Amino acid sequence: MSRRNCWICKMCRDESKRPPSNLTLEEVLQWAQSFENLMATKYGPVVYAAYLKMEHSDENIQFWMACETYKKIASRWSRISRAKKLYKIYIQPQSPREINIDSSTRETIIRNIQEPTETCFEEAQKIVYMHMERDSYPRFLKSEMYQKLLKTMQSNNSF
C-alpha cells in the first residue's frame, strides 16, 4: 500500500478521505485495549502497518503478516518456496528488511529451512510480536494517526 493511496494516510494529511464505512468506532476503541485486540480485528493490522510504514519500521508487521499467510500454505513445495523467500527477506543477516531476533532463533530457522514446517517461523514471529507490543504499539496509540482516526470516528458516530 503506497502512502498516496492509503486512506489512513490521506486522512492524516487532512484530505477529504473517509475511513471505510464498515470500520466502527467500537473496533477503533478496541485497539487501545490491547495489542492482541488490535491484531485480531479486520482493520487494526492494516492501520498499524500504515503507521509503522510512516515510521520507516514496518518490517516487523510485514514479517508477522507474512508468517500468518505462510502458516496456511498446504502444499509442501509452496511452503518450501515461501520459507526460503521469508528467510531471504527477513531472517538472513544483513538483508534489507532483517528483523531483530536472537542468534539461537535464527540458527534454528537456518537448520529447518530445507524442510520447513508450518511452525518454522513461529518462534521468530513470537519475538517480533513481543517487540511490536512493547515498543511500537504504545507509540501508535499516542500517534497523530490513531488520535485523528479516533476523533474522526467519534465525530462520525455523534450524528
From Swiss-Prot:
Keywords: Signal transduction inhibitor. It holds the Pfam family RGS. It comes from the Eukaryota. GO terms for molecular function: GTPase activity. One of its GO terms (biological process) is G protein-coupled receptor signaling pathway. Disulfide bonds: none annotated. The keyword Transcription does not apply. GO terms for cellular component: cytosol; nucleus; plasma membrane. Residues 34-150 form the RGS domain. InterPro entries: RGS, RGS_sf, RGS_subdom1/3, RGS_subdomain_2. Inhibits signal transduction by increasing the GTPase activity of G protein alpha subunits thereby driving them into their inactive GDP-bound form. Binds to both G(i)-alpha and G(q)-alpha. PANTHER family: REGULATOR OF G PROTEIN SIGNALING, REGULATOR OF G-PROTEIN SIGNALING 13. This is Regulator of G-protein signaling 13. It comes from Homo sapiens (Human).
